[in-house]
From Swiss-Prot:
Taxonomic source organism: African swine fever virus (strain Badajoz 1971 Vero-adapted)
Record protein name field: Uncharacterized protein C129R
Tagged with keyword Hydrolase: yes
Cellular location(s): Virion
Family that this chain belongs to: Belongs to the asfivirus C129R family.
Length: 129
């Protein structure tokens, strides 16, 4: 059973994707358990996604085995309304993941190093002139 989609404006979609990173398709299978993801379907429908339960996941859909990502809406399996669902990779056009603290720290450090490198290039360029 497919969940009815909520329609989000482009502005709402942009806001919901704040702090999320677009993951290249060849890296989808590396998204680990517990990561929160959002995605666009191949029909360009925005989905708010869920937490990764299994990835990759071999799902049987209409008697066909497909590589999928299995998601859940919470970690409390006993909570009212807890659901899991599988989304085949070939039904996803764009997949976004929320980075964890380690990745955010690495990104921050790379940005600082790049800024310092750019400053060094500017200093060298001014001395050459």
């Amino acid at each position: 059973m497919e969940h009815p989609s909520t329609n989000y404006t482009p502005e709402q979609q942009h806001e919901k994707l704040k702090y999320y990173v677009l993951i290249p398709k060849h890296l989808w299978s590396y998204i680990k358990y517990g990561t929160h993801v959002r995605y666009y379907t191949t029909q360009n429908v925005f989905r708010v996604g869920g937490f990764v339960l299994q990835n990759p996941y071999e799902a049987v859909i209409k008697n066909e085995v497909k590589t999928a990502i299995r998601l859940q809406n919470s970690f409390n399996t006993k909570a009212k309304g807890h659901v899991t669902w599988a989304v085949p990779y070939d039904n996803i056009s764009k997949l976004y993941a929320k980075p964890d603290a380690i990745m955010l720290t690495i990104q921050e450090n790379v940005e600082k190093a790049l800024h310092a490198l750019n400053q060094n290039v500017l200093t060298l360029a001014s001395k050459i002139r």
